[in-house]
């Protein structure tokens, strides 16, 4: 049985819609997408929705929304396993007919009792193969007579099952350690092992990139490939993603749903770059910041690590600030407008040219897209809140407030209103009052933006314009 698959390369992302697209699933999707694009292959999207109790249309839509936000376009699908049930049933019956599987009439209660007895006796709680001993004709007659039954795979009782993994090398399991696993439940619903292999064979999947937690499933699937007379795909099991405490990434480490990162103002390119480096290493000398073209060009199975990756949130935030700073303001504007819609913000000056200029001024200080609807709100609307700590620190002295009001009057009567002229007016006022210009600058910044930190004060004034600058400075006494 060959494990070398010739072109064309076909990979798949096959999530189960029992939850939203999470970080681990997104990384798997990204690796498949990158590999398909790197080799000019095909990415198939398959929704493994056979868990009828837990799979919901909302979760399916959540996965699709997450994929689209990430920018991971697929070439085929989505295919839904619930629409392919006849294929799985036919495959199970074919395996029974070829002697690779058999009908199991054991009840759930009986199986549970035997497992408990085995555990109590110190034995592995594996299936005892009692139905494997039933003759084919007898089993067929019982099934024909209406006896409820599942279908189990007949695992070879001796020998080993091995496969070559592109990441971990040769992996081998002793067959006696693999119990006769269920292929088709008594209600006709296929198990993961059967449906995934039938689909991968039918869809001509050449490479399977998935989490390392699937390694233990692989020998059973290899046996199924062999029993079906199908060529083995190339397996590449990618390392798990851990939290900072080196335990499996979970909700207690923060957000795990991909869309929650969108809600937090992360831009897709930053998230893709960050995810790509969780378990994959770029060639030596490559920069950390890698756009899509570079990632596609550099990605290879050889670069996938054996070691588990650690989710470093500060690193994600660093990538995000880097990408926001590098974005043209015109590209940021529609993303920021979505943030404004979320909070009901309507820009006081909707002129696109002015908005772009304002974004250009602010983006070097932006940590995420939410900043443009939060701490930068004063640049777009008069309906903003003042930071209490900033007010307490820089506007506590009534004398400063008095000087800011006077500063506003001087700006109202000034000839020019440029960065240079506004700075000169402020410094002249500070000199006349015998105070340091820095204190006046800090107070004016709070009066104009509500924040202690902002871009250059005089650039802020020019961006806001004379009228708004004067109006806000005149209200300095009223700020709370």
Swiss-Prot record:
A molecular function GO annotation: zinc ion binding
Main location per the UniProt record: cytoplasm
Chemical reaction(s) catalysed: tRNA(Glu) + L-glutamate + ATP = L-glutamyl-tRNA(Glu) + AMP + diphosphate
GO biological process, one term: glutamyl-tRNA aminoacylation
PROSITE patterns linked: AA_TRNA_LIGASE_I (PS00178)
Gene Ontology CC annotations of this record: cytosol
Gene3D superfamilies (UniProt xref): 1.10.10.350, HUPs
Group of enzyme by EC: ligase
Subcellular location: Cytoplasm
InterPro entries found in the cross-reference section: aa-tRNA-synth_I_cd-bd (IPR045462), aa-tRNA-synth_I_codon-bd_sub2 (IPR020751), aa-tRNA-synth_I_CS (IPR001412), aa_tRNA-synth_I_cd-bd_sf (IPR008925), Glu-tRNA-ligase_bac/mito (IPR004527), Glu/Gln-tRNA-synth (IPR000924), Glu/Gln-tRNA-synth_Ib_cat-dom (IPR020058), GluQ/Sye (IPR049940)
Motif 'KMSKS' region boundaries: 248-252
Pfam families given in the database record: Anticodon_2, tRNA-synt_1c
Top-level taxon of origin: Bacteria
SUPFAM superfamilies on file: An anticodon-binding domain of class I aminoacyl-tRNA synthetases (SSF48163), Nucleotidylyl transferase (SSF52374)
Sequence positions that bind ATP: 251
EC identifiers of the protein: 6.1.1.17
Motif interval(s): 'HIGH' region: 15-25
Disulphide bond pairs: none
UniProt entry keywords in alphabetical sequence: Aminoacyl-tRNA synthetase, ATP-binding, Cytoplasm, Ligase, Nucleotide-binding, Protein biosynthesis
Membership in a protein family: Belongs to the class-I aminoacyl-tRNA synthetase family. Glutamate--tRNA ligase type 1 subfamily.
Subunit structure: Monomer.
Entry function: Catalyzes the attachment of glutamate to tRNA(Glu) in a two-step reaction: glutamate is first activated by ATP to form Glu-AMP and then transferred to the acceptor end of tRNA(Glu).
PANTHER family: GLUTAMATE--TRNA LIGASE, GLUTAMATE--TRNA LIGASE, MITOCHONDRIAL-RELATED
Descriptive protein name: Glutamate--tRNA ligase 2
Species this protein is from: Koribacter versatilis (strain Ellin345)
Gene: gltX2
